[in-house]
């Protein structure tokens, strides 16, 4: 993966993006784990966290870029703050979910073993919920890298900024190259974090410091030697280009012309089929669905959603749903809200059906499940 990044001349922006992720991801993990544990221990805290998490996850990303720019200015620090706000909620939710799934027998066994509250939390509860917490770590890494392009709008450097420039110039092939670099970083970090979390400690006694850490010492020495070689090589490469240290952007390989030609071939070959599908989808599915939502009377919408809230959560949920819909109805964005609602309903329905079918089929085979998870990582991080 890093060979691809270096050969295609994206090493420097990739390291800028990697440094951003290596700062924001641990911060998101610590904040998310702490809030998740706090929410698990206190029902009031969980009730207070739920609306905050809902707002943080559903508010459009560009909406909170403006206050961040006003309060903190532009640059990498502003991009880091925006990324932390965007990537922390999944960690909080999955921590609470994982801790809630722990059976009472596990907690009772920990208490019977003499654990105090601190030991019960860190020696029993969190290790037992490790699977869900690791999913949260995966989502944090994916969300941090997915935010790189949006953070570039407020001055964050790295692959996101280069991608924004390529898209503004309609260079599809170059944008795809940069997007693949983002995916590579995401996959590498996800696999490393998963391997570190699943690594079993070596409890064999009578091992000295070197025997316990010989691999770490070897790779540290190898890294130092390679750094020295790269520094010395700068005196031998002509024109000042040290390819052992950094491959410049204009000296790297590129497949952007091939990717541009491939996109043009798809467009020229399948234009009529794609256009026919678009027309069918607009005229027979999305168009009628949009009109049905827009023609729905306001009072019927109130009754529908408040009734659903009452059935699911009782009178309290009914009143909350009704007050929120009333706020939208009194604003000037009722029709825009219905248009957004119809698009979200269609997208959620298609995503849920396809996700359940594909996930159920792939869960029957280890190879298929690993393959589909890699594909999911690709689509979650590809800008």
Which stretches of residues belong to each language-model region?
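Generic hydrophobic transmembrane alpha-helix motif, especially the helices
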Residues: 20-23, 30, 40, 53-87, ...
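Hydrophobic alpha-helical transmembrane segments of polytopic membrane proteins
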Residues: 159-196
